[in-house]
Amino acid sequence: MGLFDFSVKELHDKLVKKEISPFDLVSESFNRIESVEDKVGSFITLNKEAAFGVAEELGDAGIDPNNMLAGLPIGIKDNIVTKSLRTTAASKILENFDPIYDATVVSKLKNAQTINIGKLNMDEFAMGSSTETSYFHKTHNPWDLSRVPGGSSGGSASAVAAGEVLFSLGSDTGGSIRQPAAFCGVVGMKPTYGRVSRFGLIAFASSLDQIGPITKNVEDNAYLLEAISGLDANDSTSINQPVERFSDSLTGDIKGLRIGVPKEYLGEGVDPGVKQAVLDALKTLEKLGATWDEVSLPHSEYGVASYYILASSEASSNLSRFDGVRYGYRSPNATTLEELYTKTRSEGFGDEVKRRIMLGTYALSSGYYDAYYKKAQQARTLIKQDFVNVFENYDVIIGPSSPTTAFKIDGMINDPITMYSNDILTVPINLAGVPAISVPCGFSDGLPVGLQIIGNYFEESLLYKVAHAFEQETTFHKEKPNL
């Protein structure tokens, strides 16, 4: 049994009693990376020397019994800036970017005395659902190396599933935590928009982006969200909501819970194996005293279309800062200012990023703004209202995290429309801004299936309670890939 088979709480107790040391945990992490990283490719940059240095300092000082995460190894998605540790967003244009400050979540993790093992691979600028658009390399799913780990936080999910780190941070703009968590058989939480500061997150779509935790089990996830949540003066969209002790909600008691199951989430396009795993999960929840009804989120069909208009529009604005002038890649072939812009961006961005910048620029252009961007915003309002309506009568909404299990590497990369359509069950949650968690709920042909539990605004505690109750009745979260 490896050290990462223990939970956060178990490892904390061992550290406090000095049965193990932070140095042991960091060694476990790097030994595992040495063993499997060539197969999975979870990381872009390793932080080995600094990680061992922090581990030794913490070991000498002793672990604070009240600091649950102290001494535990974490991986951080490479679009979250880390002071003096290369942060690339998996793009050539930021290949050698060395940030001069920490993201708020990184500062919070340092205060919690976690140990940063390194920066995790992702789709370039978080644009993708497979971690195939990374400038550096593709990441492979630990359950089947011929398949994708999901995206855009593919490295964050694969590193946890492969046992390279105990837990990780990802970001979720349209499903980028929940879908890879589902594909890799781990737990991923997309918090309410504004629950976690975005300061230091390299922006893709500012009205949709949210940082969240990826872990092996629900309890660990709750501890990690506690550590990174809270109001931040540096982020005007962070919300002044008390930081709850999410771990206190894990009572196992969900008697009387009212579940809404959208007919749109189990209809055409959902793999039979995925649908069956979700229906079996609902039976488990019924045994625990919950009830469920079929409900409707009638405007879900507009989710993907409106999401890709809005996200691409915001990206076209956010990514205009990468021009070769102040930081990042600069084309050596430019002789005029105009060439500096065009060549730097043409050479520095990958195909998917350029596709979305062009789509967003088109949607915002004067002749098409009303037809596309304005209409997408109107659809977003309707989608948001759908959730408000259902939550008047139900406590949570449940469906699959993804309509399929992990697909083959190179299977969709040249078919962007099919790839985009795969986000159909996750993007409405980001458009509405509500929280959702993906937990392992079974297997289909040997590949993990994720159960998506969606809550009302700032009801992460309830999501953790439901997810934990389900987890305690099943063993899916204990299954590990054979690497």
UniProtKB/Swiss-Prot annotation:
Allows the formation of correctly charged Gln-tRNA(Gln) through the transamidation of misacylated Glu-tRNA(Gln) in organisms which lack glutaminyl-tRNA synthetase. The reaction takes place in the presence of glutamine and ATP through an activated gamma-phospho-Glu-tRNA(Gln). GO terms for biological process: translation. SUPFAM superfamilies: Amidase signature (AS) enzymes. This is Glutamyl-tRNA(Gln) amidotransferase subunit A. The active site is at K77, S152, S176. Heterotrimer of A, B and C subunits. GO terms for molecular function: ATP binding; glutaminyl-tRNA synthase (glutamine-hydrolyzing) activity. Belongs to the amidase family. GatA subfamily. NCBIfam families: gatA. It is an enzyme of class 6 (ligase). InterPro entries: Amidase, Amidase_CS, Amidase_dom, AS_sf, GatA. Its EC number is 6.3.5.7. It catalyses: L-glutamyl-tRNA(Gln) + L-glutamine + ATP + H2O = L-glutaminyl-tRNA(Gln) + L-glutamate + ADP + phosphate + H(+). Keywords: ATP-binding, Ligase, Nucleotide-binding, Protein biosynthesis. Pfam families: Amidase. GO terms for cellular component: glutamyl-tRNA(Gln) amidotransferase complex.
